Amino acid sequence: MHKRGLRHYNMPVFLILLLVSVIMIFPFIWMVLSAFKSNADVYTYPIRWLPSSFEWSNFEKVFQMVPFLRYYWNTILTSVLQTALQIAMSIGAAYAFAKLRFPFKRTLYMLIQSAMFVPMSVLVIPLYQMVSGTGLVDTYAGIVLPQVLGVFTTMMLISFFTTIPDDLIDAAKIDGCGYFSILWHVMIVNSVTAISAAVLYAFLSHWRSYLWPLLVTNKTEMRTLAVGLKYLISEASSAYQLMMAAALMSIAPLIIVYILCEKNFVRSMTMTGLKG
């Protein structure tokens, strides 16, 4: 009786979650289908849900209209560099706040926490003035460096590092390990799951970054995918099937990366959430 009552109780919840899931995934499905439609299929009425024929030429036209491969390369390069630098800084900061003692530790920790509530739009003007004053506009350094500080990934790793027993660190010190050796052989080795989740989060954030690359790139060859799609919209005019094809190619790597790392991401977020 208890199990039967539980099933009946969960059914409305299941139906609501199913409905919400369908609503959330519908735009993605529509984008995928529209990417293969002809211009006539897009504008036909009543709505044609499936393409009359799969127009693979839509993807070819995108490459002809804008330097899409260049946008891809810029996005991959800047995202990888930003992620690597951000994770390296987050690991170092998390280790210090989780396991070391130093003056004003609590004050600095509160400052880092408060930085999570400062939106990027507030910092855009001073950051742009700094980048422009140092001549880094239209350079990879200008895109990468202002975005390498990751408060969220730092807080995530701090929460995870505090779960590592101090006995492991004490044993490493007895064996003659210094701070950097402990960081590598104890903290990082035992935090692969959390670091993987932080890498995934940082990479996704930098890949879809739009505002900052838009401000510091004036040359076509320096644009990233997010910025390049904006200019494709003006070039493609009313050819929505080309916009959908470009959008699909832009998010394909993100989908692949997330599918490969999804288990680590969920596991790490659950563990750090419980600890916090």
What residues fall within each predicted segment?
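A structural signal for multi-pass alpha-helical bundles of membrane permease subunits
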Residues: 2-276
